[in-house]
Amino acid sequence: MATKKILTNPEETFKKAIELIENNQLESAINILKEAEKNFPNEFSFTNLLAQISLENNNINDGINLLKKSLQINPNQPLVLFDLGIAFLKNNELEEAIKFFDKSAILDPTNIKIFINKAVILNKLNRLDELINCYQKIIQLDPNYIDAYTNQAEILYSIGKVDDALNLYYKAIEIEPQNPSIYNNFGNLFNNLDRLDEAINFYEKSIKIKSENPSAYKNLGLVFVKKRKFNEAINYLKKSIQNREDYGAYTNLAAIYSALNSNKEALIYYDKAIKLKPGESEAYVLKAYHLQSINEIDKAILAFNDALKINKDHKYLFGERLHSKNSICDWTNFENDISWINKRLKEKKCVAVPLSVCAFFDDPEIQKLGAEIYIKDKYPFNNNLGKISKYSKNKKIKLGYFSGDFGEHPVAYLVTELFELHDKAKFELFAFSVSNKIKSKTRARIEKSFDEFIDVANYSDKEVALLAREKKIDIAIDLGGHTKNSRSSIFAMRAAPIQINYLGYPGTTGANYIDYIISDKFIIPNELQHCYSEKIIYLPKCYQPNEENIPISKKIYTRKNEGIPESVFVFCCFNNSWKITPQIFKIWIRLLSKIEKSILWFPGFSSLAIKNLKNECFKLGVDEKRLVFSSIENLREDHHAKIKLADIFLDCFPYGAQSTASDFLRAGVPVITLRGKSFSNQVASSILTNLNLSELITLSEEDYENLAIKFATNPNYLKEIKEKLMFNVKASPLYNVREYTNSIESGYIQAYDRYHDNLNPDNVEAK
């Protein structure tokens, strides 16, 4: 009787349902509410309560249907409209959620929760203008709602409204001056703007308010990494993990120790990161990079494999693993791996770094694509320094050469004499040494050749770019490109009005802020210009500079001392092991099988590379003893004397010899090369063309093999070519550094004049 009495009174019925819910008698409550719906069809409160029960039990669709039923009874219920918005948000039906939030706001424009939840959706949908308006409405309703200021600031920063973003952070600080999170987030904004000293100031303020502040300590550490102040970075990163473990802090500590060559500490922190998050691929990949750098390639491959099991699409992982395998001549699944990388590049995925792409493919279009993908991901144009000023035209053009290899390095050997011969009446020379190099004879020569030699190894990228601007460098010449020790971020900020890619990296950078690449017509014919993001400064002869006189020691080298039989024909390849492909190696082994008294001579590769090459040789039916491996000479003058023991140098494909080709040709050893299309392939062909030795350039694998056989079986022809080579080396303009210097200076002047005539960069033919 009591229940019947209750069911005749809507208020008593509703109270009873609430009582049952509070006593966890949910089923009884639902039964009463459903009965009440029938008895009181115009009373929407029962339907609303049923809807809430459904939503709280995650029966979202039932809840939505009940709320809609309630609106049929009374459409002017702002809270029901709001609840429908929440339900559709939970169901990820975002447009429907917005529709009901907007309807609710019409009836109840002061309900701040409507706009807070709508902001969540607009952020997901990346509808930034509407999102900004939404945050402004929240601030109107509650001027002290901090998240509306800080979240809006982040959006304004992302769309380039930096000053507006900064103003919002300052307002947030006025409202809550003792909130450490605001200072920390403000520091992040300055960090993103590369205003590092201001970032440090705000991180320190955050720590002053809250000393137990691991996030601010970590962020401070990362700022000091950017500033290349590694000891300070280590100190702050270690403070960030005093009371809690942090994956990012561990990986960054490991990366710093790796950069400082503290190998034991680097591995300790990579392993800590892996232990903390074994399901994350990042630490495995970074550990593999470190192991690569210390030549523990087998361990690097294992770390890459661990990362692959977690995330096959981790950026650059697949390409770097293949590069590591190639460096030890492990060619298992080589063709499949190459095919996969090609496919992923065409899908514009970050699958291989540019240098590896050059090693994998003789296709300048694919190389350009790989470089563009990499630049967009790693080093996009950075406008944090603002547009560069147009300097007045001066009598002397200020050239800035940027390199991490001003020391005992092949690039330095090639350009030292060029630096010395630059016309100081026309040019003022600045060197920016971007990585630490030990003192050496070559570095001393280079330092003397410049008007200013500036060691910026410990400067941040922004500081280097600013310094170049302060010095009013007219032309910045990047001698690194996409190679080790390069600092592409410097050029992404525009270090100079004219920026040039030269020598260190044999290919396009893919960067829209690099204006020119220096080359020659042989390497980049007109029909391949579209494969380069830069315009081309064409030198009239070979693009590669060379020393006029190379040092050759008087030390006597004999075949016997190198383990080479006296009476055999010596094929050799002194390229890096990662340039050797299974395809080219098969040709070399066929040569050994056809030329009975012959050997293949290599430099001192790693023990793993030697083992794998011997195994491949055995598989192909040739005695592994016919592969001879010599130690690498510490002094280049000894190297130049030693390589004369070879009869023929066999070039690799698709990534061919460059300075190595020059070394062997100067030593009187003919170089057989297989011409392709890419920059990294054609340098040897360009050198040979300029030496008037185009007969050493082959256009097919068959021609390559046949020419090698001809030399090995026709000693008179070999003698004739060697005599021609030695004569041409002495007579060729290839080794006339003064003539080369005049040509490259002509290219610089033309690029400079175009700029001051307000003309866009265009292809230039140096004189």
State the predicted function of each range.
Residues 426-428, 589-619:
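A conserved nucleotide-sugar
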Residues 480, 651-657, 675:
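Short Ser/Thr-rich beta->loop micro-motif in glycosyltransferases that lines
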Residues 650, 664:
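Donor-sugar nucleotide-binding helix/loop cap in glycosyltransferases
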